[in-house]
UniProtKB/Swiss-Prot annotation:
Family assignment from sequence similarity: Belongs to the D-alanine--D-alanine ligase family.
E.C. number: 6.3.2.4
Residues the entry annotates as binding Mg(2+) 2: 296, 298
Major localization listed first in the record, in broad terms: cytoplasm
Record protein name field: D-alanine--D-alanine ligase
Amino acid sequence: MTQKNLLLLCGGGGDEHSISLLSANFFEAQLATLPHFNVLRVELNAKGQYHTQAGELCELTNSQQLRFDDETKAPWNVDYVIPCIHGYPGETGDIQSYFELINLPYFGCDSESSSNCFNKVTAKMWFSALGIPNTPYIFLSEFNQQSLEQAEAALAKWGSIFIKAASQGSSVGCYRVDSIEQLASSLEEAFTFSPYVVIEKTITARELEVAAYEADGEIIATKPGEIICASNTFYSFDEKYAENSQAQTVIEADVDEAIAKQIQEYAIKAFKGMKLRHLSRIDFFLTEDNEILLNEINTFPGQTQISMFPKMLQNHGHNFAQYLSGNILAQLKS
């Protein structure tokens, strides 16, 4: 078959820029095994500039071409894009909106589903509307005395809370608060990351993850894996990506079969209900009373050496490169 020009777009310039580059390494290695794709890796920096690995500045135009600042270099026609960008502007749906505007096909969830999942306010509304249990919560829209009083009431009611910036991923702007002394500073800090803040009841629970994705025309939800953190800690940004992280990952969690099946059913319900596409990682809590609570959905999960998504996909029996190729080719034919 004729080779397709595939743009591997990474970085993004946000808080998760460096992690996006690590994930791009994985995608690049997988794509190298697929001869029908001609891959060009381009990084998007914090200034909104595109540049190749050789440092060449370029621009993605509305004619579906990469045009280079060096006008002696011919434009590069783009057939397809993998937006390997965690956080803004990838998982927020912003970059997908541009692709949709210029009719450029791309891998992953569309702009609306990405935005709905990334924003914790809309995500929780969707979880509840779909009838999927999730953690008790309140929303705040600005840092003022009224919000502080609402947060104090939540802390008094629940004993321990998580304060989360509504529009951030990978636990950026996320703080556990166990005492009134921590409250004001944590709330104020969270508002520096997002105009909206979610306050959730702290749940003493196991942290389980499911890879939910499309393969061979069907939606798959793997058996849940597990994140095991040190006592009295949570899976923070540092715990996810630091070399000295104490968190442990288990690809197939030791849970009752009926519980695993229920989690998988919730994952597929969320995938279908929120109209996700190609890939996602859906995170759950499992309490000591075996209550299942949906925590969050990642529409472009990490693909680093320690990331759960590619490991769970492989454990389920799928080859990542073939899974990737199948989705891309099916979309290009449609």
